[in-house]
């Protein structure tokens, strides 16, 4: 029995060495605490696009999926994914500018490729002073404007 536990642990460690990106990136669904930052990221996408060209390294990428269904909690005001989609449509010029800027910078383009994020999925972003990205995305099947 001890050998089985040791093997499972060894496989877990070996898997993280073979595919480190699977361990480093986490997807999260939008929660109550993400609502305001999500709307802010979408509404300010155009101004945040201007900061992308100065990014020289991306130490981490966090992803918040806007279209993962959530179970509403009592007193929760988490919008539906359709409301986020409407916000993207209203701010489409800024969102498009952000997507183009992320693809124009080779460092951010490589980070998106590493985590298999298609630019058409991106609705908004937060950019830290160190270059870390927190991306607010839609699933591939919800990327149409």
Q: What do the predicted segments below correspond to?
A:
Residues 62-114:
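Mature extracytoplasmic domains of secretory-pathway proteins
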Residues 42-47, 104-107, 115-120:
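Short amphipathic alpha-helical surface micro-motifs
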Residues 115-145:
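Amphipathic, charged alpha-helical segments and their helix-to-coil junctions
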Residues 21, 72-75, 118, 131-132:
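Solvent-exposed, non-transmembrane amphipathic alpha-helical segments
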Residues 51-59, 63, 110-114, 120-127:
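Surface-exposed patches in mature extracellular/periplasmic domains of secreted proteins
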Residues 2-71:
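N-terminal leader/targeting segments
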Residues 30-39, 79-85, 140-141:
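Short N-terminal helix-initiation segments at or just after the protein's N-terminus
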């Amino acid at each position: 029995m001890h050998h089985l536990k040791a093997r499972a642990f060894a496989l877990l460690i070996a898997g993280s060495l073979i595919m480190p990106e699977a361990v480093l990136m986490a997807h999260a669904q939008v929660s109550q605490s993400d609502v305001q930052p999500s709307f802010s990221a979408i509404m300010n996408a155009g101004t945040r696009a201007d900061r992308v060209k100065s990014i020289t390294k991306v130490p981490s990428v966090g992803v918040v999926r806007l279209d993962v269904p959530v179970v509403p909690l009592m007193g929760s005001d988490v919008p539906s994914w359709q409301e986020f989609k409407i916000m993207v449509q209203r701010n489409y010029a800024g969102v498009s500018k952000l997507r183009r800027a992320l693809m124009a910078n080779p460092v951010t383009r490589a980070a998106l490729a590493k985590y298999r994020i298609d630019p058409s999925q991106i609705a908004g972003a937060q950019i830290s002073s160190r270059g870390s990205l927190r991306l607010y995305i839609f699933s591939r099947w919800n990327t149409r404007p």
